[in-house]
């Protein structure tokens, strides 16, 4: 499934692969070039983000924010699980609040 999330920016959901664990993977592409990926878990009651990785040469362009904005439009409850210390300002900036030391939550 390809979903446009910004000018030239697409989020592409990949099929689950058991050898990669029980995760839903998304590629982030800009004009057909992969610029990052997201590792999530989609469940009926919640959507969990384990990581959003934008490749270093593409950082600072708002791509991670565009991914989160899309997820926020689609899901009423999002958990950012295993948030690293250096990533906390990003999650706070996009509207998440800390529930525990490494888990941030966004609710509609």
What are these model-predicted stretches?
Residues 73-86:
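Conserved GNAT acetyl-CoA-binding A-motif
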Residues 54, 60-73:
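Conserved acetyl-CoA-binding loop-helix of GNAT-fold acetyltransferases
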Residues 91, 96:
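Conserved active-site tyrosine of GNAT-family acetyltransferases
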């Amino acid at each position: 499934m390809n979903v446009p999330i910004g000018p030239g920016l697409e989020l592409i959901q990949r099929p689950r692969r058991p050898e990669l664990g029980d995760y839903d993977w998304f590629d982030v592409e800009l004009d057909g070039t992969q610029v990052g990926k997201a590792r999530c878990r989609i469940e009926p009651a919640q959507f969990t983000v384990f990581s959003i990785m934008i490749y270093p040469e593409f950082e600072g362009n708002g791509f991670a924010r565009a991914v989160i904005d899309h997820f926020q439009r689609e899901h009423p409850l999002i958990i950012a699980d295993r948030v690293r210390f250096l990533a906390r300002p990003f999650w706070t900036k996009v509207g998440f609040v800390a529930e525990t030391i490494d888990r941030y939550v966004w609710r509609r």
